Amino acid sequence: MIAFRAVWSALLASLLLLLLAPSASPVDAFSPPEASLTGGQSLSKRSLFDPSCTGVFDRQLLRRLGRVCDDCFNVFREPNVATECRSNCYNNPVFRQCMAYVVPAHLHNEHREAVQMVGK
């Protein structure tokens, strides 16, 4: 009976760990870091973002611009808004419309400058 309770407690503890860490898979925990989905190829920082953004790589600016698109998508709930807003490195009419809708007017110039910096 004591062995059953120990096994049961271990099972519940492992299930609790799985529920608390859904993003980590058991395979990732035991595989070496170089064994990734890319077949061992390293990803550059820029590959995580739109390749059309050839200007200054600034995570903060990219996050700020991406947040405009995310907020716009959350308002309109149109699937094409999320992708079109980010196209051409945020230099497009959809991004400008989203900016007009979700960004206060006094911050528009700041966002326009950010688009110019990351998209050069």
Swiss-Prot record:
Tissue: Produced by the medulla terminalis X-organ in the eyestalks and transported to the sinus gland where they are stored and released.
Signal sequence range: 1-24
GO molecular function per UniProt: neuropeptide hormone activity
Disulfide bonds: 53-89, 69-85, 72-98
Modification Valine amide, positions: 118
Protein name in UniProt: Crustacean hyperglycemic hormones 1
Annotated compartments: Secreted
Family according to the record: Belongs to the arthropod CHH/MIH/GIH/VIH hormone family.
GO aspect biological process, one term: glucose metabolic process
Pfam families in UniProt: Crust_neurohorm
Main location: secreted
Keyword annotations from UniProtKB, A to Z: Amidation, Carbohydrate metabolism, Cleavage on pair of basic residues, Disulfide bond, Glucose metabolism, Hormone, Neuropeptide, Secreted, Signal
Gene Ontology cellular component annotations, sorted alphabetically: extracellular region
The organism's place on the tree of life at top rank: Eukaryota
Described function: Hormone found in the sinus gland of isopods and decapods which controls the blood sugar level. Has a secretagogue action over the amylase released from the midgut gland. May act as a stress hormone and may be involved in the control of molting and reproduction.
